[in-house]
Structure formats: C-alpha cells, structure tokens
Amino acid sequence: MGPAMFMAFRLWNWLLLLAVLTRSEATSYVNESSNPTAQQAPDARFAASSSDPDEGISVFELDYDYVQIPYEVTLWILLASLAKIGFHLYHRLPHLMPESCLLIIVGALVGGIIFGTHHKSPPVMDSSIYFLYLLPPIVLESGYFMPTRPFFENIGSILWWAGLGALINAFGIGLSLYFICQIKAFGLGDINLLHNLLFGSLISAVDPVAVLAVFEEARVNEQLYMMIFGEALLNDGISVVLYNILIAFTKMHKFEDIEAVDILAGCARFVIVGCGGVFFGIIFGFISAFITRFTQNISAIEPLIVFMFSYLSYLAAETLYLSGILAITACAVTMKKYVEENVSQTSYTTIKYFMKMLSSVSETLIFIFMGVSTIGKNHEWNWAFICFTLLFCQIWRAISVFTLFYVSNQFRTFPFSIKDQFIIFYSGVRGAGSFSLAFLLPLSLFPRKKLFVTATLVVTYFTVFFQGITIGPLVRYLDVRKTNKKESINEELHSRLMDHLKAGIEDVCGQWSHYQVRDKFKKFDHRYLRKILIRRNLPKSSIVSLYKKLEMKQAIEMVETGILSSVASPTPYQSERIQGIKRLSPEDVESMRDILTRSMYQVRQRTLSYNKYNLKPQTSEKQAKEILIRRQNTLRESMRKGQSLPWGKPAGTKNFRYLSFPYSNPQAARREARAAEPTDDDGTDSGFQPLMFSIHSRAGSLQERRQTQAVIPMKRLQRGEKALSFSYRSNTSWEDQAGWRRMDVLRPKPLFYAVAEEYDSGEQTEEETSAILSRWTAEHRHSTEHHKSHSPLLHRK
C-alpha cells in the first residue's frame, strides 16, 4: 500500500508540473492577444470589457495574467507539500536521508524539466522575497520553540562558539582563498580580498536542521544538542550582519579607498547592529505580552497579535539597519515566557502549529528552488576555486571547533569530550542560508557571481548529502553520550529547589555564577515584570504554578500522541456534581484567610539575605528558645486536662514521650515512686516518719507530697553518696518548680487500683522499697544525662 500511494503522489506532482508549464504557455499567448492596456492598470480587465460597446458577452475567457503570481506561488507550495507527504509515506526513507535531500532532488527534477522545455523558472527568490517573507518564519519558529533553560545555562559557551566561530571561519576561508587566487595558473586574479572575505562570510553560514533531527532521534546529551541548536540560531544572524558590512565596504571601495577609520566603524557597527536588534526584539516582546493581558474576551485575535508583533520587530530593526534576525529571535524568546500565560489554550495550539507550518513552507520552497537553480546556464566552473573552497571549509571548521572548545573546557564543570567535538565539527552542514546569500549577490559589484553560486552549491550538496546522511550512523558508531530520560514533574521541582539552594550557598561563600544571576532575575521578574505583563498575578507559590504548567503540558502531549484517546469522559452525574459545587465568594475566602492568619502559629522568618556580613548570630537561638517554651506550655495545658492521652493509650502507660522531654519520662518514674508504700517497721533512722500510701485512696495533701519527695535525697545523703540531680525539675529555677507544684495540685490523680493489681496487699517490705528507690534514681540519672545531651539550648555558645 505504501509504494502504491507513493507512486500516486508522484503522479500528482507531474500533473501539477504540467499544469504550471501549460499556464506559462497560456501566459505568452494571452500577452500577445490581449489589450496592451491590460498590463498597465490593475483594473484593466474591467476597463477593457466596457471599452467596446459593440462587443458581446463571451461565455468563456482566459485571463492568466490576473492570477499569475498567486496561482504559481500556490502551485509551488502545493508541490512542496506533496513532496513531503510522499517522502514520509515510505517509512524507511526518513531514516536513510534527511528531508532536505529529497526536496533538493525534487527541485532538480523540476529544474531539469523547465530547462529542457526552454521555459524560465518563476521568480520564487529575490532579495526582497527572501529577506522579507521566507527568512522571518524560519527564525521565528527556531526562537519561539527554543528550550530556554538549557540555552541560558550554556549561553557563555554558545556565544563563544557561535560568535567567534563564525568570525574565524569567515575570515579564515576568505584569506585562504585570497592566497589561492594570487596563483596565476588558476586564473582567479580578478577576485580581490573583499570579494573573498564576502564569500567566506556567506559560506560560513551553517544550517544544521537535518543534524538536529538526527540528534533528537538518537537522544544525544543536552550539552551537545544545545551547542548545535545555538549555532543554528545565532550563526545566521552573525553571518548576515557580516555579509551586509562587507557589501557596504565593497560599494565604498568601488569609489574610494578603505582606511583604518572605516574598519573601526565597521567593527562598531557589527556590535551595534547585534545589540540593537536584541533590544528591539525584547521591547516588542514586552509590548505584545502587555496587549495580550487584555484579550481574555477576544481570544480569536491572540495569534494575530503574536505574529504581527514578531514581524514588526523584524521590519523595525531592518528599517534602522539593525539585525532583524536577532530582533525576531529575542522577540520570540520574550513572548514565549509571558504571552503563553495570557493566551488561551486554543490560541496556544493555533500559534504553535501555524508557526511550524510557515517555517516548513519557507524551508521547503528554499530547498526546492535550490534544486531548480542547479540545472541551468548561470554557472561557472573552476576546479581550483571549488575544490579549495570545499577543503578550506573543513579545515577551518576543525580548527575553530578544537581550538575554541579547548579554551572553553578550562572553565566548564562538564567539559566536551573529543567525541562531542568531532560531532560538532561534522555537523557543519551548509544549507538554504548560504545558497540564498550567494544567489542574492549583486552582479554589478561581483562579476564572478556565477562562480560563487556554483561553489556554494557544491559545498551545500556535499555537506547535505554526504555529512547529513552519514551523521546518524556516525553518532551510533562513536557511542556519543546519551541524555537521560525526560525529567518528571518531581525532578523539575527539585531542580528549582537546588537552584535556590546553590544561589544561597554561593552568596555565603562569596562566589558568583549563573545561579546568582538567575535568582536575581527571578526576583526582579516576580516583583515588577509579571505584575505588569501577566494577566492574573495570583499570590501563589511559584512551585505550585510550575506544577500546574507542567501538568498541563504533559496532558497536552498525551492527547497529541493519542494516549488519552481511549480514556472515557466523565459521566454526566460527575459533571453535574462538579457543576453543583458551591463556589466560595471572595469575601468568604478573605475571612477564612484572616482566621487562619490569627490562629495558626507562624515561625518567625529568617533574615532575608544569606550574606555573611549582615547575618544576625542570635536569631536562631531565640527561635529555638521560643519554640521550646511554646512546646512546654502546650504540654502543661494537656496535663491540666487530665491523664487521658491524645493518642488513645491508657493513663498509666509508662513509656509515653513528649517532644520537649527526653525519651525516659521522669513523671512516669515519679508516679511509680508515689505508688510505693513503706511499712511501719521501716527501720530507718531519719528524723521523720515516712508517709504511708493507701493503694485504694487518692492523693494526699500538698504538704504530704512535699515530705515524700524530700525522703529520697535524705536517704542517699545518709549513705554517703554524692548528691546528684535526681529529677528533671532539679535543673529548673524556683519559679519553674513552683509552676510544677501548682500543676501537681491541679492535676487529677489516677486511681491506683485501676492501674496495677499487684499492690492490693497494702504492705511492702524495706527491701522492696529500697529496690523501687534505686530503680527510680537510676532512671532519673539516665534521663537527666539524655536531656543534657539533646537539649538544643545547651549546645549553643
């Protein structure tokens, strides 16, 4: 079924081609037989129909001139679209060669037919068509769908490689070819230095679109992918700026000599053109984001605002002789960040696919016209110039790659390996940019323009067909380091947490890196820009908003891939139940927020900055003390309410634990000591009679309990032992002891007969009493030491 459909689409291509040729012949016939005034005014056809009153109404007329330009453009776009459809019908073909190879082949076949039938190809490309209509959609799509975070994490290496690498390649190739042209045997003496430098600037413009497709399929590591992507994004802009400056030098050199001041002015213009283009793009991006803030009720015009303002940034920059490519790139990156949060989901889908469609159509037309231009008489062949051009392109790319990355690896945490550098060198595929710049050279300034076009076509064909086809097997053969699996929402959230943590650590250590810059920009963005440019500035956490955005993105991807196609929609009952939920009014929400603010405990905030020079040393100590006091107050309140514990254990459980106390609770031991009942014949030689506890009676008076507590230390003092801290309250002040005693008075005591049944005898011997007191002393010594070692206040200086 696949080959049959492929042949059917190929047949449609030939029929469309015959229709184009037939219309071209009809054009010549109509031009000879029609009224000459029809070519002078746009409404000549209507004037001609009413000029002769004796002429009757014709049933059938042919006026191809009236629809020639849109008709031919539509046929070319349709031919390119059918070629892409036929290319993807055969599933093995996209894995064998890039899509650009097929488009060039189709264009070469169409060009051969046009050349064989002695017809002139339609003017698909000239200076205004390329720079004003074909190039902006390609650059806009690349900038809008650029992965922002990896790009700005590697922005230093990308600018170092894309900027300086383009200059090294341009001047290296130009100077090398100039020395070759000085050899008289090659017959290239009429090509001066400026012409060679201009050719070097246009031939250094790379177009690794096919390489990026191979990288996405092979899932190479993120650093390697971003270096190629950044080169594809910025290299065209730098090459076009250098191309325009050298054309201006060529025009100047035709009438006067170039001085050192002119060279300095050219360097200054190079910087101003690039920075000015970026500034214009950011300004237009902010304006478009601000306008989309008010389009919630008219979402149909949101895609129009995005496309019009991006195109206006390009035109405004070109009006002031700035870089339109860098302007539309900066505008796309700015709109991606802010406009997406203002537009609806339907508008976002429309923007996404319409932008990809325009970019695909532009690239397809350029590649097809490249194939059409291959067959013709506008070529000049010189073996020396073409072969040395191909050789110097490879040599200078290798020099620039291995030299610049050797320097950048000295400052990178994760350096590029030799395999990565070789893949970057092999990815220098020339494409539509180089051919378009060569084709648009003015013939009056460059008499050897045909030679430049031929050399550009040879380099483009070699890199697209040879390097573009073999890059995939080479990546698999070298086993280039692959990227990890796609980050989940949890990993993305934790990466943001680590960014904040690293920024704080760097500030404390006095270091400075991109984490600090990113953190400061986020603060400025959240404080000023988002309040002005974003429609709904809700006071919610950035992590919550990021989670919502990632969830929405993941759901859209699942729907687009068909994963959710089999999932059933919610039942009508569920939808009615959801709709029937009462929504809270803003007043109710505000009152709930006030209640929670007053009632909930809020830990005092830490100092806002992490700077080591203004960090207060006593803040954390006060916080710890305050939290400990609050926990003790909570414990006292719970003990005043009775012995019923909140987690459902019986009142006499021994080993329960509060947060502010050590693990061995001294209160349980004190209850055991109070439960002990000494006998009358105790034999003790102390100066008082110890109190007797009745197991079935409740607690005695306050004076009796104080005397009972004083028995224990007096016994140990008489034995000659060293006085120690026997209870938890011995480490507290007099006021705290008074508080504990007041608490003991108010606290209800448990019924001892409900706790233990082994005390029903009502009597105990002296040995049993001594054993109980010894066990109570050991437990209190252990609990006191444990409390001292774990107290947060005792460890601070």
UniProtKB/Swiss-Prot annotation:
Residues 14-28, 70-90, 421-441 dip into the membrane without crossing it. The keyword Transport applies. Induction: Up-regulated upon metabolic acidosis. GO terms for molecular function: sodium:proton antiporter activity. GO terms for cellular component: apical plasma membrane; basolateral plasma membrane; zymogen granule membrane. The keyword Translocase does not apply. This is Sodium/hydrogen exchanger 4. It comes from Mus musculus (Mouse).
